[in-house]
Structures are given as C-alpha cells and as structure tokens.
C-alpha cells in the first residue's frame, strides 16, 4: 500500500491547481431520456438472507437490476475486497460512501479526514478519479472551511470529492455548501452531491414490488447549483426489510442518477 501511494504522489504533477484540474465534473445535459436506478445499504450486497438468496438478488427481485450499489467504507458491515469482486461480477458499479463522526469545523480537520479516506481507499483498490461521498448527518454541524479542506485534499490524493447530505435549506449543509460556492467555486463546483431529500412518501419503508421510482427528477439543490447538477438522489429509505441468515434485519435505500456519466466516470 505504501509503495503504491508513494509512486502515485511522486508521478503526479506538482501544484494544487494542476492536481485539481485532473478532477472533472461530468457534463450536465438539459434533457435525458431516462433516470438510472441504484441502491445503497449498510448491509453487504453478498450477505445471505433467510430465504437463501443474497441481498443483491433481493434488490433485483423486488425492484430492477441496479446500475450502482452504494456501500460504506466504514462501519460494522463495511465494504470489503470480496464484496467488490462480487458486485463487479454482477456488472454493477460501486458508489463509495465514507461515514465519520469526528468534528467537522476547520479546514485542517477536513485535510486530516481526507487523508484517512485516501488510506482506506488505497487499501480497497479504489481507482484514481473515483468519487468518495462523505456522509453528513443532518444533525451534524459542518462548515464551509471543513468541506473546502476535505475536498481540496481529496482531489490532491487523486479522488473526486462528494457529499451525501440533506440538501434542504433548513439544515447546515445547504447553507455552508452554498457559502463555498460563493467563496471557493473552483473547488466546490467539482464536488458531487448525493441529495437524501426529499424522499417520496410512498417509497419510504416500502414492501411492494410494483413501484420502482418516480418519473420526475426532484431532489433539493443548494443555491449555486441547479437540480440537474445533483449527482445522486435518494428518494426512498429502509425498503424491503428482511432478516439475513444471522437474524439481522436488512434494508436498502432507493436512488436515482440523472447523468449516466456520474456512474460511468465517478463510480468504480
């Protein structure tokens, strides 16, 4: 791991501006023909359920084949190399999510967290350029300075910064990200946003297989962005509960992507 990291840093062009220019934002189309379905879960996709199929197969049975699978790099059931191989064998892209409960106030705290993310991403073999979405809980106090530090350092490490957050204007993320778009647009415009609001009532905790996803793309967007620029929208939570082989209740969340280049270029 250390050798690979040293090699990558040595061969990268010097200068933060040059490094930042290597991270690109997927082009946004005014009109799209379809919305692309995917899921995210805190449960491993290859977890065997009580009915002798995997969580991935349970998703397919109850919805449709997912274009991507969002998985956490941290936590009790975090993403493993074995699960990466499993999902890739299914032809499914992976959206990397990082969850951390440490304070998110200063630019230096953002730098330090990005370095932690980089080490873990390298251990898992996540390729350069892939997006890593930092999950921000709606109850967390997060600042523009922290996000600027996190995003700039993660780009320096070769990854695309993203945030999975409540984008409603009533919460801190929306306000602080919007401040960042005003003061440091060159950094913040390269961040991908995974909006977890609004969820659509009939999709939350759903158990029916008849509804797949809403027809219209309606995530909340921070000021400084348009809805079309939101990368991922989580429109339903905690769906299709079922116990796994160990007796633990599993669920998954429902997501849409409007821009296929987010999946092609920023997931792995």
What are these regions (language model features)?
Residues 1-19:
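N-terminal secretory targeting signals
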Residues 30-52, 63-151, 155-158:
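Substrate-binding cleft of extracellular glycoside hydrolase catalytic domains
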Residues 52, 143-147, 172-183:
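Distinct, well-ordered alpha-helical segments
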């Amino acid at each position: 791991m250390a050798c690979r990291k040293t090699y990558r840093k040595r061969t990268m062009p010097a200068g933060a501006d040059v490094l930042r220019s290597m991270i690109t934002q997927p082009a946004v189309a005014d009109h799209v023909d379809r919305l692309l379905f995917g899921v995210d879960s805190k449960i491993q996709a290859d977890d065997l359920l009580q009915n002798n199929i995997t969580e991935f197969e349970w998703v397919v049975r109850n919805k449709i084949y997912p274009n991507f699978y969002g998985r956490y790099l941290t936590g009790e059931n975090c993403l493993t190399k074995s699960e990466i191989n499993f999902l890739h064998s299914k032809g499914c892209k992976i959206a990397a999510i990082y969850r951390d409960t440490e304070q998110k106030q200063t630019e230096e705290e953002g730098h330090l967290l990005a370095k932690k993310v980089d080490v873990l991403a390298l251990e898992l073999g996540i390729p350069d350029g892939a997006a890593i979405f930092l999950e921000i809980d709606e109850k967390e106090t997060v600042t523009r300075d922290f996000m600027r530090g996190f995003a700039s350092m993660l780009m320096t490490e070769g990854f695309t910064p993203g945030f999975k957050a409540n984008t409603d204007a009533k919460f801190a993320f929306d306000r602080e990200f919007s401040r960042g778009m005003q003061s440091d647009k060159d950094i913040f415009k390269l961040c991908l946003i995974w909006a977890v609001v609004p969820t659509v009532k009939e999709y939350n905790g759903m158990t029916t297989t008849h509804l797949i996803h809403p027809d219209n793309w309606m995530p909340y967007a921070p000021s400084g962005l348009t809805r079309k620029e939101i990368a991922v929208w989580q429109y339903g939570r905690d769906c299709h509960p079922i116990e796994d082989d160990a007796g633990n209740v599993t669920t998954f969340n429902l997501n849409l992507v409007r821009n296929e280049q987010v999946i092609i270029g920023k997931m792995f």
